[in-house]
């Protein structure tokens, strides 16, 4: 499966690299009544954001669920965009970091990038994390209080994925206007979106992921699982819409639903009763809000993506989610003569 995954990613990246030389293929002819292009302008911005991964454990026999999160923090950075070039540099802000006493320490490495061309969106994910805590531990474990959560420094995750989607109404609808600020949506418009993705989530721990203190009536058939993995190939379809208000304001909402086949693995050995290859679903959503004041702009963007898996026993449901939030303040400089 690793070979298939590697070949699949290679084909996607190879296709993307060759497509860059085909300017007409990537660049859409814009309806100037709907979209204003800032291609020749220099855009400088200050931004703060957070990227994280969530691990949701759901008992499929009832409403009970657990959520693990890494200890999060906000980045503070600066960015610049000019024509096809964009660069962003950010650093961790200690004052906005959650308490290590309460949530524990998380070690992390990865790149989470969202690329918007005129016709396509490309989401890239590489995330390696170690160290999680159980959200609202005191409601699940009687020995914990609100002052300190149940911490799992042994839980680690490796998440890799790429998603490519085509924007059908690319002449009138602009993702760039909502999330990269290199264009302006002048009139409200929407678009059908379709494409595909390949995603790999791997989670492991030194002992069972479900805490031993949890009431034994929950997760009765899957309390000993310490490893899980998902390799998914999905076809995606969805819709995005941008509502323009007060001439310079924009509110964008999109939802993409994916379905396909995925390989599920649990533990070092696969139980014969577990159906590894099966059809499952994922979904992703985007929300953007922005407003322009002449050459200045303020933007808030939120992106959420989740891939689901479960045991054949119908006992444990696992949702792997990636989250991205960013607040930007920027200014546009005209370099045209």
Question: What is the predicted role of each segment?
Answer:
Residues 20-23, 27-40, 119, 169-190, ...:
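Short loop/turn motifs that connect adjacent beta-strands in outer-membrane beta-barrel proteins
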Residues 38-44, 74, 83-87, 118-122, ...:
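Outer-envelope beta-barrel architecture signal
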Residues 43, 75-77, 110, 161-163, ...:
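Membrane-embedded beta-strand positions in outer-membrane beta-barrel channels/transporters
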Residues 44-46, 78, 89, 113, ...:
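Membrane-embedded beta-strand positions of outer-membrane beta-barrel proteins
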Residues 48-54, 82-86, 91-97, 117-119, ...:
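Transmembrane beta-strands of outer-membrane beta-barrel pores
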Residues 67, 135-139, 146-161, 203-214, ...:
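Extracellular/periplasm-exposed beta-strand and loop segments of Gram-negative cell-envelope proteins
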Residues 161-164, 321-337:
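Outer-membrane beta-barrel "beta-signal"
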